[in-house]
Structure formats: structure tokens, C-alpha cells
Amino acid sequence: MVEIIGGGILGLTLAYELLKQGRQVRVWERAPTLGGLMGRISFSELDGMSCDRYYHAILSSDRTLMHLMAELGLRERVGMVATKMGFYHNGHSYPMTTPLEFLRFPPLNMLDRTRLAYTILACRQIKDWRALEQIPVADWLTSLSGERVVRNIWAPLLRAKFDGDFSQVPATYIWSRLVRTTDTRTRGGSQELMCYLPNGYQELIEALATAIRARGGEIHTGTMVDQVQVVNGHAIGLLVGGQELASDQIVITTQTPIARRLLPPEAAEVSTGWGRLDGYLGIVCMLLVLRQRLTPYYTLNITDPSIPFTGVIETTNLIDPACVGGYHLVYLPKYVAPDSPYARMGDDELRTTFMRYLRQMFPDLRDEAIAAIRIGRERYVEPLHPLGATDRIPAVQSPIHGLFLANTGQIYPQLTNGESVCSFARQVADIVASQSRSAAGTRIKPDVTMNLL
């Protein structure tokens, strides 16, 4: 029996892949529902309308994810839409979707635009990313794009993404992001194609759960795993609600700080090793359900440092509003460090603050256009990979025989998204299924972890 701790998309995909290879699995999820960050939220005041708690994109280039959805019978339900992107700069919104709009972007002169275009093209040509992980992203971007482009475009975006401090962020971050997003462009770059499921990622979560149960797997929700049991360097089972359950192998898919709490004193050395790379940013996100469209953009990036949220993401410019009761969904995310004042704000204060800045951007937004508001919070969302992080990434198989760690912090240099998580889960399944319990220390090498390029 393989125990999988965590019922998010990583844990469920891993369980599904292991079942395909003939292994018995049990999935443990402490929340009452599956999906983790990709779960749904319901609005009783809107006749039970539900939508994704947070926004999640499916790109037209997400090959592993598309293959998984095809296996689960979802491929025909995937819609594809040409979306628009904009930039909010100095109090104005500018379209930045087509090459012509790019050339007209006022904050940049012709030389700046040329250098920005060169940066994007240069990223596409880089196949070996290793040298980039030792270079601070700001230094690398300055060498390619120039100081004006960094000051007006890159630095504001990086400050927003990393809650102000991106001094230790390696160049691999921008490289990976640009390579993935430019893969969605049509020939000539005039359109950006994105995909969606009518009922969001919950469709994939439910399809995975159905497939797991159909193949004999077990799923336990609303159940807290107390501790991994270790004897003489072997993981022998779990302690769940005071009951000891014998296991052959255990895979922890939770974020590293949570995973470390599950280890007993006998695993102190492993915990220390995992702790070498366990930094995460959290997120606070205000979701507005509107009765009318706010912008024409799926993503409106923000370069104004006074505005607290990272961007304005209007997902109903991708998904059909009919999928969410005819409403329009706007997400205002802010990534937060543990000591950020926004992480400590109460819901009412956060709502008031975000609405003040949103109305500064959109003065025509009226109260009667707002059907509902929700505040979402998560402590561990974005794993932090500082300069030279590769050697600090924990091995999938730990030195304790039969104990594995598999979470988003080990996905590198690719960014955390549905595609990279599903691809990672497939490769972890191969390791768990094929390696004997006597072999320890196998690491998925970062350069072969993902198959996105």
C-alpha cells in the first residue's frame, strides 16, 4: 500500500498514475474537499453559484495536462479562447496583446521596445538554464533589456510577485515564465490562446477522484494524518486519529513546512535536510463577483507601486460567464511574505483597502455592480528558489526507506502550474513504483523534471 498525504492535484495525479502501474494507494486529505488551491467556492447568496477559489490558467501548450484530461474523458470539454493582456501604468490601461500594441506602448521608446523584444527572443533560444540560476534576475534583465525597461516594466512586476524583495531571485524565473507563456502565441504572435474547463479545475479533480476509486484506490477527506511512523530507518506506516496503519511506502505531497511537521523525532536529520529549502510566499486574494464586465483583459498587469495587488485577473474574459451564472469574476491577488502587513490584515480591512485602489483604477465601478466579495488566504503558495537553489532541492526519495517527498518546491526551474505539477507527479510515480525500498537518495534532476520546452 502506498499512502499519499495530500489531496491536491499533485497527490491525486500521483495516485492515478500509481494505480495505472498496478500499485494500491490511499489518499489522505485533511480538508473536507479535494483540490487544495484548485478547489471551488460557493455563494449561497447567488443561488449556490460556484467558481474557482483562485484563478488557474490552462495554456494551449500544456501537453501533459491535455493528455491527462484526454485519458479522463475531459478533452472534448476544453474550450480555447484568444485572450487579451494589458498593462496599467501611470493611471492608464494599455493593451499589450498584439505586436502593434506592443510597439505603441507609451512608457517605452523604440530602443526600449526593441530591447524588450530581444529579451523575449533571447529567452526562447536558451536551452541550458544552469548558468542563469546563479545570476540575479534584475542584473540579467538589465543586461538584456536595459535600465529603462527594467525600471518601467520588469522591476514593478517582480516587486509585486515577490512582495517587494526579488534580490535573491535567479534569472531562471523570468526565463521559465517567458518560455511557457510565449508558447501560447499563434504564429506571428497576434493572439494568445488559453484554455479552460467549463467548471474549472474542479472537473479535473472530480475526474481524477472518480478514476482513482474506479481502480480500487481509497480517498479519505476530512482526515488529519498525525505522524509518519519510522522504525530503524524505515517508514512503516501512519498514525491517523490515534490509529496505526501499516504501509509499504509513504509519499508526502504537502508543502515542505507542513511535511516536516509530520516527521517523528527519529527523522530529525531528514527534517533538517528538507528545511534547507522550505521558503514560501503566501497569498491574499479578493474575488469580486460582478454583474458586468470590468475590463477587456484576462490579465491586467500593474506597474504602479502604490497599488497593493499584483494584477487584475478577469477570468470571465476566458471562461464563458454562462458557466458562472452569467456573472463576471475578477481576482485581485497579492503574494505576501510571512511578515507582510497584508498577511496580517483582517478581511474587512483588506476588502476596504483593495476596493479603494480598485476604484482608483476604475472610478466608474459602482456598488450595485458588485454581487459578492470573498477574501481568500493561503500561507504556503509560491515556493521560493533563491540563487543557486538546485543543490538544496530535496530528493524525492528520502534517506528513510519508503518515505518520499513530492511537492511544488521540488519543481524547478519550471514554475508552479497545472502542467508542471502533473508532469512532476507522473515522474514521481515512476520513482515510487520502480525503486526498491532499499535504494535511497534518488533525485529527479531539474533539467529533466519537466517536459515543457
Language-model region placement:
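Active-site/ligand-binding neighborhood in enzyme catalytic cores
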Residues: 13, 108, 117-231
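FAD-binding beta-loop-beta segment adjacent to the flavin cofactor pocket
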Residues: 319-325, 378-405, 409-412
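Glycine-rich FAD pyrophosphate-binding loop
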Residues: 19-44
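Mid-domain catalytic core of redox enzymes
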Residues: 21, 224-330, 334-343, 348, ...
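A conserved FAD-binding loop/helix module that cradles the flavin
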Residues: 407-432
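Conserved Rossmann-like nucleotide-cofactor binding loop
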Residues: 10, 33, 257
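Dinucleotide-binding Rossmann-like beta1-alpha1 core, especially the glycine-rich loop
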Residues: 46-129, 156
